[in-house]
Amino acid sequence: MDSLIAALSAGQTYRSDWNKNALPTTAQVAGQWYDLSTGAGNPMMNSIIGSSANLAHQAITETTSITAASGALGGSIAGTVFTDTTHGSGRFTVGMALSGTGVVAGTYITSLGTGTGANAGGTYNVNISQTVTSQTITGTAVAGGLPHGGDVGALNKHLLNASAFSSATTTAPAIMMLYDMLACYTITSVTTTGAQSFTGQAAWARYADGSGVRAFLVPSVVMGAGSPTVQLSYTNSASVAGRLTPAAPSLPVINTTAPVGSIAYAGTGVGKYGPFLPMMAGDAGIKSVQSINFSATMTSGVMNLVICKPLAYMPITTVGVASERDFVNMLPSMPRIYDGACLHWAMYAGAATPVNSSFMGHIDTAWA
């Protein structure tokens, strides 16, 4: 406690206010989990999800960015429609910032048009109306994490307080979960069945031993009509390989036409879990992932396996009333925030939540 008081006295503290919107086109269903990192607001949308190569390991920190280099060799913007006529490399995703000669600063993709978010052409809707003639247009994806005070080197940073609330109708009850996003694997091969191996594996930059690390699936492009089961092969935090998502009582079942931002298998009933993919009995975390197996085609869409470390939970019990947590005096207390942490919120909808509902709050951190 003395070191905490000294840190506060020395100004080694940071307050970060946030405001995130829920799904922009689809109401949130009661009984399901949603990843608010894919929503607009402050911090900005996480467009890293869905941007990397198929099945490839993408490490994530608060400053991670991915550039679709020469993404559109023949790209143009008319009004609020960006057209990728002659595609170069990489893929365009919702939330990705666009740049090029004459492109207005701050332009980003708000939604898909005829473009699919895959390595192909098509149209995408943008936030600023403008006219840009055919040229090379580049897209840059960012992680959009909640600021927490920057790197502190040899010092230890901890979460002191947090709050969350919403004034939108029927946004309560809800449960908010703060997590650190460690890595992501974009899965564009959603019509492939059987085990698909991940590539470019590397240790998690934070929580390298895997203790407490979990995984969930979230679409970055709305999924098609398929509803397969899913099984993850992983190595646990005790370095035991060959662990599998348990088949009993049931493997997780992907929701048909799962929308962007939804935890793809969350809900109520057989095969519904949330927010995380179940682990085998006795496992305390995920050290690495080896493959993923879908039992049937999902027809279309882009799925993403997100690796994360959950840090804190808090309930929102009443619309317009803030939920607050004092992590200094609660046990277990003061979750550590590592350098490079990419903090995001997930939400469990206890009631049908209207389209584009706003959630807001803050966190306080300190380091000593």
Please give the residue ranges for each predicted region.
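Sequence-level detector for tyrosine residue identity
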Residues: 14, 18, 33-34, 49, ...
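Extended, low-complexity, turn-rich repeat/linker tracts enriched in Gly/Pro/Ser/Thr and Asp/Glu
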Residues: 149, 166-169, 220-227, 298-301, ...
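Small/polar beta-strand repeat architecture
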Residues: 66-145, 225-226, 234-334
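C-terminal interaction-tip segments
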Residues: 1-14, 18-22, 240, 302-368
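Hydrophobic beta-strand segments within beta-rich accessory/binding domains
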Residues: 95-98, 214-221, 341-350
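Aromatic- and glycine-enriched beta-alpha-beta binding-site module
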Residues: 206-238
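Extended assembly-interface regions of large multimeric machines
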Residues: 1-67, 141-219
